[in-house]
Amino acid sequence: MSVISKVSYSLYSQNEINATDININYVKDDDEVGTVKDSRLGATDGVLCRTCNRTELECFGHWGKVRIYENIIIKPEYISEVIRILGHICLTCGLLRSREPYTVNISSLTSGELKKLKDKISSKKKSCWNSRCMQPYQKVNFSKKKVCLVNKTDEFCVPNALVYEKITSIHHKFWPVLDIHQDPATLFYRGYFSIPPLLIRPVISFWIDNVPKDTNELTYLLGVIVKHCNANADEPTIQKAIIEYDNIKLISTNSTTNNLSYITSGKTNMLRSFVVARRKDQTARSVLGPDSSLDITEVGIPDYVRNTLTEKIFINAFTIDKVKDMFQRGEIKYYFNKQLHQLTKIKQNKFIKNKIHLLPGDWVETNIQEFTNIIFGRQPSLHRYNVISSSVRKTEEDTIKIPPGIANSQNADFDGDEEWTIVEQNPKSVIEQSILMYPTTLLKHDVHGMPVYGSIQDEILAAYNLFREYDLTQDEVLNILGKYGLEFLTDYERKDKYTGKDIFKFLINEPEINYPGIICNGEIIAENIDSNFIVSMKHMSISGLITDYKSSVEGIKFINKASYVFKRYLKIYGFSITFRNLCPDFEFTKKLREQNIKKINDIKHSYVKYLYDVANGDIIPLSRSDEMDAVDSILSGLTNFNIQEIEKYMKEVISKDPDNSLMKMSCAGYKVNPTELMYILGTYGQQRIDGEPIDTKIYGRVLPYFLPDSKDPEGKGYILNSLIQGLTGSQYYYAMLIARSQSTDIVCETSRTGTLARKIIKKMEDMVVDSYGQIVYGNTLVKYAANYTKIQGSVCKSVELIYPDESLTWFLEISALWDKLKNGFIYNQGQKIAKYILAPFNFKVFMKLDETNPMKSKDLYDKIQLVIKDVRENYFFDVTSIDFIEYVFLTHLNPSRVKVSEDTANLIFEKLYEKLNYTLGGGTPIGIISAQVLSEKFTQQALSSFHTTEKSGGIKRKLGFNEFNQLTNLSKNKTEIITLISDDITKLQTIKMNFEFVYLGELFPEITIEEDKNYYRIDINVNRLYIKRNQLTELIVEYMLEKFVSYSVLVKNWGMETNIINEHIIRFSLFIVFTEPVNLNKNKFMMMLPGAANKGKISKYKIPISEYQSYTDYNKTVKLYRLTVELMGLKELGTFDLVNVNVIPGVWNTYEIFGIESAKSYLCEALLSTYGEGLDYLYQPCDLLASLICLNYEPESINKFKFGPVSALKRATFGDNKAIINAALYKKTEPVNDNSSCHFFSKVPKIGTGYYKYFIDLEKFLRIKKTISEKLIDKKLVDIGDNITDF
């Protein structure tokens, strides 16, 4: 079959509908011939198609027709299109509503002139210009009640026949003026209505509430249409039946009946369910377990799965002998004869006549063999490391077994997790997966380049203990190494005694590999081996360094060997941990508990004294937030005290008992840290929901264990007891209260994050790398350089950012580059400075730490400049800046830091060219990769129990998913967080004073009311210290009262005076005459006064001004003040003096003021900041997403495809059921390029290996001659060599 390059959409013409000879003219029939279940309409389960005699896998169905006699029916989805066309013509005479189209040559008009002509036809003229007609124009609507077109003025029915006659009489030369793209007759059914094939309405397997239905709902609706047509019903009746079948929402608002529109829209649409994500055969699912005997590239499949699933073997010259043997051994289950087009089930002792021919193209099915490639994964599949393809191995029992090394990448534990598997049947896909999805190929992460496989659990402890072994005899070493012992004897140097370091050197087996502080000439020079060296996703992972030096094959080999050796070491030497290891000395926990009780009592005593002094009026109280922060920090001090005591205790235990198992675990970086020990031995600490202490409930308390309005910290969720002590009833309740909120979070967040992940992947999936190393989206250039280095992301490496220093050689050149680059490294409003920089690859593994013959600094500098100049011109075409690559080489290869020989320099630059030439292939699906990495991270973050929060100004926000969601949805007309930064605090104080919400009650006023003859006198005494603390003035308080009283509808007349009583008290006196009824209004007024007399924007957050040191350079900071306020727009700041104030608005304000490029930069930094600390490597995916959102003239939400040519099939799979309807109406032709379209037309998308064509002519292999090389003459060899050099 030839490859489909483009697809056109159009409507079926009536002639095409009439062409079928399958007449449907019965409602019921014994053998269902002539009914809507007629087997001529296509094959169904186990029944061949009576039209083409094929099975349901090969028959795509056939259309039928039912006669509608003289009726004319409008196709339901195009009723609005018919009404639109009628709006441009006269319904009486059929002429257009303007004379001009008849007087000009339409085909010669430009697009601008054609647009003007269209406007004239749409003009609001009242009556027809045709002198023979002169009738008023009629407005036509569709009546849901009458189910027909009606005249808007008198609600009289407009016959479909009249509409059909007028619309089809429009001459085709006028179609461009009316935006008609094909014969308008295709908008109607005339003579016959089409009956769709059985394929879209299967009679079996249609389930509702677990009750099997014999008849699909669509089939039932079609039966109703046939029934009305047979009865020759009137037009509206047939029209209504067809609308109910097509889209019932056209006439009914609250119906959820299945119809064509319903099954092609929304989350469960047919395209998404049966084409994009259909269920597959040859799959299995089972519980997951570990098997340490498996290599990383293997998976254990139980016997019952291997005996159930089958794989195909195609007959050709290479396989025919094997297949014959398998027939004789009775291992063949099915045989497919291509000539006869027949699938035969092979049963034991059953004679088969004239069906087994074993010709090329035939295939057989047999049980899965060992070493067949099988795809398996664990759900949810958040990124591509969850789904891999490994070699099948036999395994005991009934569970799927995986090597423990891949558990991290699949986020799997062995507590009942399940894994799914699938055996692909197409040899092409088996070959493809065995390369592209093989664990060796997937070892390094696509973005940060760290290995995704590594040791887990007890292997970490084994590595730590093994490294510390010494005085090992050769026999002991051989025993530990097991099956690798023979290799050790032949390859490793002989010694009398060996250490753990020797075993690691043998496992690494790369004598040339180096890395500062870790490896020197293949030997580990670090003090200890902890989790950082052997666990997956670590920068210092030894397997990662080996991969950077050699390839993934050697990296996987190390993981396999190390895992085997660690397990064997544990088996021989053992490792155990008991309760004694956890708490070797109960005196310590007793003493710590006594100290905790003493300290919590001191805290409570101080707090009570403070509350007592406030009640007596000796001091003024702190504001509620300041009081909570103060208590919080004191309790945090108690927690920190526990951690410090435990750390001190751990050091004492290590000095007394260095073999304590728990301490070993802690040193190895496995499971135990001082905070976790604090929960067990010290105190369980403050319980929080979303970073906040627990809110009080009824009577100002959480539990009835405490007095109403109690301020006791233990009543607010501080758990003093440790787990070893056990929790009291109330403490246990607090622990479970947090567990409840976390459980709810996880349940709710899973679906939200999954939905957003799907949208982001759908949005980014068609962004690929082109053959120039640029990122393109369709035909639009998005980025000049993929990954900024034009090198695959898994190869790039974050290295330490070395700041300019006078001790560095080439200091002036480095400083000049730094001045160009520094603004990119100082971010987050100057609060942070980058510690790492992207290197094009991990060149440090090639640098020898004991170099004796270094290059001269000038020669090295010239070589670096030569390479950079060549790369800039020939790889980046002088379009993209690569100053950062030059900076990395000048600082990291600096003679003042390292000695680099000429051979090492040449090797490093050869490797650089190798990476530039070969790693980033054209078609790399960088959009999908970036989308998956972002989605995986925010899903993990949202599901994590521990959300980080930060106070950004007064707005306390949960970092992570919520904000990421808002940024990508880009909702307009919502408040935006605006940050103001200045070195002058007074300018910010003015803004704070105006915008911060303060109400009278916050000033703790004493309010009294007295009745006079004609009015009420209300005295409000306020302590001026409260006014000062809230950074207000007496005038502002006066203004608050004045504003409230003047706008109050309860007040008839009023007056006001202000008096200073003494040094501290100021009195505001209100003289008020209330409206009738006086008593009721007086009571309402007094109830409202403390809260309703306020100023600023109503908000539960204060607007604090924070002070921080802002970086201006790596060694310079300035003191700045920052304020964050939530506003609708910047207009609200228009009246303030903002000279020399740095205003950082939200995304829409940024776009409206500075344009799309600034919005892109803002979005990139904002998206990255939602992930928190330590995830800077996500900058590239965030930048790519921001670039896509800002690809056009305004930012576009990821929910929409407003800009750019998005194919109808992509829109359809995204849930837009109108996409294909509109494409057919406008007769669109679209290229089959994007992922969604390629799904439907069996076309390999041009991503990844899409540029390679699979074609093997086996005949050539059979005829190949060994002597072919001898026929090449010497001259030809020289020519070939020259050509390769030129290339």
Swiss-Prot record:
GO cellular component, one term: DNA-directed RNA polymerase complex
SUPFAM superfamilies in UniProt: beta and beta-prime subunits of DNA dependent RNA-polymerase (SSF64484)
EC number(s) given by UniProt: 2.7.7.6
Localization per Swiss-Prot or TrEMBL: Virion
The UniProt record lists the keyword Transcription: yes
GO biological process, one term: DNA-templated transcription
Entry's Gene Ontology molecular function annotations: DNA binding; DNA-directed RNA polymerase activity
Entry annotated with the keyword Membrane: no
Function: Part of the DNA-dependent RNA polymerase which catalyzes the transcription of viral DNA into RNA using the four ribonucleoside triphosphates as substrates. Responsible for the transcription of early, intermediate and late genes. DNA-dependent RNA polymerase associates with the early transcription factor (ETF), itself composed of OPG118 and OPG133, thereby allowing the early genes transcription. Late transcription, and probably also intermediate transcription, require newly synthesized RNA polymerase.
Assembly notes: The DNA-dependent RNA polymerase used for intermediate and late genes expression consists of eight subunits Rpo30/OPG66, Rpo7/OPG90, Rpo22/OPG103, Rpo147/OPG105, Rpo18/OPG119, Rpo19/OPG131, Rpo132/OPG151 and Rpo35/OPG156. The same holoenzyme, with the addition of the transcription-specificity factor OPG109, is used for early gene expression.
Name used for this protein in its record: DNA-directed RNA polymerase 147 kDa polypeptide
